[in-house]
Regions:
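Terminal amphipathic alpha-helical/low-complexity segments used for targeting or macromolecular assembly
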Residues: 1-57
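Secondary-structure boundary/capping residues
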Residues: 36, 58-62, 150
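Short, composition-biased local secondary-structure segments
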Residues: 55-59, 100-101
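Left-handed beta-helix
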Residues: 63, 68-69, 74-77, 82-83, ...
């Protein structure tokens, strides 16, 4: 766990708030992996995590989500990541972004490595975002995005050459 925290901190050097949020998130993830028989011992911390990070700071970074190392958060406020979402390594998330389900609870995106997601983007449903993709600000992504592709708009469509 500590290795994951240091990796996250290394790419969020300038922002103490994001370091606090990511450190709290990684610790909550670690506690959630405890065996079910003793997981109740983690309940007070998980409650405080939700109280401070979710309710007070407005960042719903669910500790059940699978998030790779070196996650970059720019501002982060208004961020929502569903518990069934998968986010790869070296991804960047900006404020106002929603990554979640469309219908069923488990119908959540799988986001590859090195994906850059612009502010106020919505990525919902059982879709895949390929490695090195870019999601433009304000985009609504409802379909798969190939690796290396840049998409923007509502609904999101490929842009550029």
């Amino acid at each position: 766990m500590s290795n994951g925290i240091w990796q996250d901190w290394s790419v969020n050097r300038q922002d103490l708030r994001m370091k606090f949020i990511l450190g709290s998130f990684r610790f909550a993830q670690k506690l959630h992996r405890w065996p079910k028989a003793v997981r109740w011992l983690a309940a007070p911390y998980l409650f405080v995590y939700q109280l401070l990070v979710w309710w007070e700071l407005g960042i719903e970074l669910n500790h059940k989500a699978k998030v790779g190392p070196r996650l970059r958060l720019h501002h982060g406020y208004g961020l929502v990541v569903h518990e069934a979402a998968v986010i790869g390594a070296d991804c960047t998330l900006r404020h106002g972004t929603t990554i979640g389900n469309r219908r069923e609870s488990a119908d959540c995106p799988v986001i590859g490595d090195r994906v850059d997601i612009g502010c106020n983007s919505v990525i919902i449903g059982r879709i895949k975002i390929g490695d090195d993709a870019k999601i433009g600000a304000g985009s609504v992504v409802l379909h798969d995005v190939p690796a290396g592709c840049t998409v923007a708009g509502n609904p999101a469509r490929p842009v550029g050459a």
